A protein has these predicted regions:
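Basic- and aromatic-enriched surface patches that contact anionic nucleotides/nucleic acids
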Residues: 9, 13-22, 132-208
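Short alpha-helix boundary/capping and kink motifs at helix termini
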Residues: 2, 6-139, 149
């Protein structure tokens, strides 16, 4: 009987500077550590990505972690162009930025600079959405939407997914603050973002 290989936990890297990873992968939030070993998932199209790392036996766990944030990526390839993992296709819809309701209020200036490096056309944006009160609520990708709006991009791609109730509550609060599209998101300094957004989240979840 083959002994099962031990795998340490998978940790996602959330910073934009780390010499172990390419800048492109860091900007896409595709950088992971398993123990001390780096693993990369690089998005190469609206549906495909390349995975790299020391141990191919760990690829599937990295992919599962990555797809928590990017379930529209359904085909994963290694550097030799071998298919590692595939999932059922996710239907994408083309939608006007003006018709997207944020579930966020602020944009971090540091994250905005990083995102600006890879957002150039509508093809670069795929946003997770939920339907609520006849609105298309963005679950994630608010910085990308803000950057796209500033660059004059009028449409993006999205897919409908599931989300916890807090996303709808956050969207309702955004509406109360007159943030009814990505055009009204407020850019703030990094230290202010951490203070304002984290304080709001802490207060919200402490009351649950």
């Amino acid at each position: 009987m083959k002994k099962e290989e031990y795998m340490p936990g998978v940790n996602r890297i959330n910073t934009y500077t780390d010499s172990r990873f390419s800048k492109k992968v860091l900007n896409q939030h595709g950088a992971f550590l398993i123990g001390d070993e780096p693993y990369e998932v690089e998005i190469v199209s609206k549906t495909d990505a390349i995975i790299r790392g020391k141990n191919p036996n760990f690829y599937e766990s990295v992919i599962e972690n990555f797809r928590f944030y990017a379930e529209h990526i359904t085909n994963f390839w290694d550097e030799s162009n071998n298919l590692v993992k595939t999932y059922p296709a996710v239907e994408l819809v083309r939608i006007s930025i003006a018709k997207i309701q944020p579930s966020q209020f602020y944009v971090d200036e540091i994250k905005k600079r990083a995102v600006s490096d890879f957002v150039y056309t509508e093809e670069d944006l795929v946003i997770p959405l939920v339907k609520w009160e006849n609105r298309n609520v963005s679950v994630d990708g608010h910085t990308r939407l803000f950057v796209a709006a500033e660059k004059g991009i009028q449409n993006v791609y999205g897919f409908y997914t599931k989300a916890d109730d807090y996303v709808r509550d956050f969207a309702a609060e955004a509406i109360r603050r007159n943030i009814v599209s990505p055009y009204q998101l407020i850019e703030v300094k990094h230290r202010d973002y951490e203070k304002l957004w984290f304080a709001f989240c802490d207060e919200y979840f402490s009351g649950k």
